[in-house]
Design a protein with these regions (language model features):
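Solvent-exposed beta-hairpin/edge-strand motifs
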Residues: 105-125
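C-terminal beta-strand-rich structural cap/linker in extracellular carbohydrate-active enzymes
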Residues: 131-158
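Active-site proximal loops enriched in glycine and acidic residues that flank catalytic Cys/His/Asp
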Residues: 4-6, 90-93, 104, 115-117, ...
């Protein structure tokens, strides 16, 4: 999977190079104020949050782990390990809260937990994702609720 359109300003319709005809579907638009008189277009857009976490914590060379979920429930899970460190990501694509029960291959020490919801995604001053909790000790089984239309990532990777 690749996210090609990071910055709207780098891609115009038909590759014309015309900055007034740029595609508005990237993670930000560095020309928001200059061309559109809208500085808010220069802010990092919400889809950057989950994408950046997945890129950071599922690095090249990771071993993807087998997961078992009932997709009809609207929950999807991915997990990986690299250098003895683990990551688990889960998404609830439904309009209802769901309960999530995880069985992990090993306990996670010093883990961080990230949650994303449209109206709640903790970030630092630059808009980069911040963990909701850190320094967690998670046993080989873990239960949590996953709100409707939300994303969860748990990792002990640095």
């Amino acid at each position: 999977i690749a996210a090609w359109m990071l910055d709207d300003a780098m891609h115009s319709n038909g590759d014309s190079g015309n900055t007034e005809d740029i595609k508005l579907w990237g993670m930000w638009n560095i020309l928001g104020e200059e061309l559109f008189n809208d500085p808010s277009q220069e802010e990092i857009r919400p889809w950057y949050y989950t994408w950046s976490l997945m890129c950071r914590y599922f690095p090249a060379g990771s071993t993807i782990l087998h997961t078992e979920m009932d997709a009809e429930e609207g929950l999807f899970v991915a997990a990986a390990v690299k250098d003895g460190r683990h990551v688990i990501a889960a998404v609830n694509v439904t309009d209802a809260d769901r309960e999530l029960s995880l069985r992990l291959p090993a306990p996670l020490e010093g883990a961080s937990l990230y949650r994303y919801q449209e109206e709640n995604r903790p970030t630092d001053d630059e808009g980069l994702p911040l963990p909701l909790e850190s320094g967690l000790s998670i046993a080989t089984s873990y239960k949590t609720s996953l709100p409707a239309r939300s994303f969860l990532l748990i990792t002990n990777m640095n």
